[in-house]
A protein has these predicted regions:
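Membrane-embedded alpha-helical segments that form the functional core of polytopic membrane enzymes
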Residues: 1-13, 48-49, 62-76, 125-151
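C-terminal membrane-associated helical module and adjoining short loops/tails
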Residues: 45, 80, 98-101, 111-216
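Multi-pass membrane catalytic core of lipid/isoprenoid biosynthesis enzymes
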Residues: 15-68, 164-203
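Intramembrane alpha-helical segments
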Residues: 28-118
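Acidic (Asp/Glu-rich) catalytic motifs at the cytosolic membrane interface
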Residues: 1-28, 36, 144-168
Length: 216
């Protein structure tokens, strides 16, 4: 729901840009009014935050509560101003993407600590292992999102330039932006190889999980 609200408010602020970059696919301003898009944002965001706060309350997790309250604000300011700045806009949206796996890690961590004794959890590195793997997934999600957002900026250069958005292609040009994109791709591939050699090859996660549940 929070992501849906983020898409709605992004389209609300991007009506002029979308009119230039993708006039045939524009929804806000043609299919629905900006006022309707604003209401969609308010309603879906409110539902998402309330559901998130309910889950946070049930799990007694302040970290989850903070994330559910912070994310809508980041998405709003991203759409209103941050996306018009080089690097910062892409960083914000990639951070929000990377938070999705972290939510799962935090929730599962709370469940494990609630249902198992601290002594049992200390006998195996189950929680650190789960957090390490989830952070790995979040890192890959972050880099992939940076790649995606950079490609989108390159596709939207014309409309962004006409509306005075200082995205990477507008500030540095398409040629230099391509090299930034290539660096993200090389980093992603390098981390993928390193992760396989360091973690996946010996199936350490599965061994840790088996050891943990054998102690029950």
């Amino acid at each position: 729901f929070i992501a849906a609200g983020g898409y709605a408010i992004n389209d609300y602020f991007d009506t002029k840009i979308d009119l230039l970059n993708r006039p045939n696919r524009q929804i806000v301003g043609r299919t629905i009014t900006k006022r309707t898009a604003s209401w969609i944002h308010h309603i879906t965001t409110a539902i998402g935050v309330l559901l998130g706060l309910f889950v946070s309350w049930k799990l007694k997790s302040l970290s989850l509560c903070f994330i559910f309250l912070m994310t809508p604000g980041l998405l709003w300011f991203y759409s209103a101003s941050y996306k018009r700045m080089p690097f910062l806009g892409n960083f914000i949206i990639s951070l929000c993407t990377a938070l999705a796996p972290i939510l799962i890690a935090l929730a599962n961590g709370e469940v494990l600590q609630t249902n198992y004794s601290p002594e049992l959890l200390m006998q195996t590195p189950i929680l650190p292992t789960i957090y390490t793997w989830i952070l790995g997934f979040s890192g890959f999600a972050f880099i992939l999102s940076m790649i995606r957002e950079t490609i989108k900026d390159m596709e939207d250069e014309y409309g962004d330039k006409e509306n005075e958005c200082r995205t990477l292609p507008v500030v540095f040009g398409i040629s230099k932006t391509k090299w930034i994109l290539y660096s993200y791709i090389v980093l992603f591939i390098a981390l993928l190889i390193w992760s396989y050699v360091s973690f996946i090859q010996d199936f350490a996660l599965f061994k840790t999980i088996d050891e943990f549940y054998s102690l029950r």
